[in-house]
A protein has these predicted regions:
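Metal-assisted phosphate- and nucleotidyl-transfer catalytic regions
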Residues: 212-218, 299-387
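Class II aminoacyl-tRNA synthetase-like tRNA-binding/catalytic domains
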Residues: 2-12, 16, 27-33, 37-285, ...
Length: 387
């Protein structure tokens, strides 16, 4: 079985090498014919696939110019159909020998490949099956793809490859591209929200001369010019608080954090945080603002407060606030206020089958461990845990 898998892997690699060789030969042929795609430095674009599809009545019959990557092709003699993916989605194009010329159509059929990038002009119409398409009158090869795209039209299937070859994942998966765009929109709206409330966005140091901040191991480097060991920051908190001390009443930072620790589905050594601090308010005031910010940003980015995340409906308009003790009482059935001593707390944990990390854990630590064991995975809807 293992031998067969190895043979299949070698066969796939040989096929990829052969396909890459063929594509380079096609490129050489195009260059020899004076059609070098890499000499095309720009292509004017005046529309995109999503706008055309969403406003067909306004675009029907009009000439538009688009650019994108060819994701499929159906050749039918003197006419063909392709799907072109641009930054907003995908649209079908209709290409004929009569419209783009015999020589260019011959190249389209024989020398152009799935994955190549084109610029094209044509008029918008609907096919007999009702699909919004573009009848191409001008087709220009802008870039030749020298490596074949993954076999699966619906995207990469190998999770490791998805993360190692993000550019391929973006090419093949529209949902991934949408996630990138939505992340950008979220950050934009968060900034707009905070800026509109008088917050000042700041950049605090990424390289520090000492290990400070959260209980996390930092990445260490060396500054050659100063002959000084330095550390990548593990949080932005302390520097932001110094700005509050310095008289800046409202500050926030969207910052990259680096922690030289383990990795799993919830932890990455490099990630982004948003921290904000405000003078002359309390944690209730910050809770109020954060809840309002989430609702405002969600409505602007998603158009609704009810969103679906991995098959689960999240209702951003309904927030719950619980103290940690209230949450443990609700989900574990034990009341923190009934524990007169640390021994009472440890006995409660034992009765629930929770093995404590520290045998002499105090009431507070027992409460935290019960929260981890019984509460955290049940908090699906927006919930603030405090006190």
């Amino acid at each position: 079985m293992q031998e067969n898998n190895m043979m299949n892997q070698v066969s796939e690699e040989e096929q990829l090498i052969e396909q890459a060789k063929i594509r380079r030969e096609k490129l050489a042929k195009l260059v020899s014919e004076g059609k070098n795609p890499y000499e095309q430095v720009k292509y004017p674009v005046d529309a995109d696939s999503e706008t055309i599809k969403n406003n067909f009545e306004a675009y029907e019959g009009k000439t538009v110019a688009l650019a994108g990557r060819m994701m499929s092709r159906r050749i039918m003699g003197k006419a063909s159909f392709s799907h072109i993916a641009d930054r907003t989605g995908s649209i079908q194009i209709y290409v004929t020998r009569q419209d783009i010329g015999e020589e260019n159509y011959a190249s389209y059929k024989k020398d152009y490949d799935i994955g190549d990038i084109f610029g094209f002009k044509g008029f918008v119409f609907k096919t007999q099956t009702g699909e919004i398409s573009i009848h191409v009158t001008e087709l220009t090869l802008l870039s030749k793809s020298l490596l074949p795209l993954p076999e699966k039209y619906n995207g990469l299937q190998d999770k490791d490859m998805k993360y190692r070859l993000r550019h391929l994942d973006l090419i093949m998966n529209k949902d991934v591209r949408d996630t990138f765009r939505k992340r950008s929109m979220i950050l934009k709206e968060i900034r707009a929200y905070l800026d509109g409330r008088g917050y000042l966005e700041v950049d605090t140091p990424t390289l520090l001369t000492m290990e400070i901040g959260a209980d996390a191991r930092p990445f260490k480097t060396h500054h050659n010019a100063l002959d000084l060991d330095m550390y990548m920051r593990v949080e932005t908190e302390l520097c932001l608080k110094r700005l509050i001390v310095g008289g800046m009443d409202k500050v926030y930072e969207v910052g990259r954090i680096f922690r030289n620790e383990g990795m799993d589905a919830y932890h990455n050594p490099e990630f982004t945080t948003i921290e904000m601090y405000e003078a002359y308010t309390d944690y209730i005031g910050m809770m109020d603002m954060i809840e309002d910010m989430y609702k405002t940003v969600t409505l602007k980015v998603c158009g609704t407060l009810d969103i679906n995340y991995q098959g689960t409906e999240i209702h951003m308009g309904n927030w719950t606030r619980l103290t940690m003790a209230e949450a443990v009482k609700k989900y574990a059935g034990v009341d923190y206020n009934d524990w007169a001593t640390d021994e009472d707390a440890r006995a409660a944990a034992k009765s629930l089958g929770v093995e404590l990390e520290h045998e002499n854990a105090t009431k507070g630590w027992v409460l935290i461990e019960l929260f981890d064991a019984f509460v955290e995975d049940k908090l699906i809807q927006p919930t603030v845990i405090y006190d």
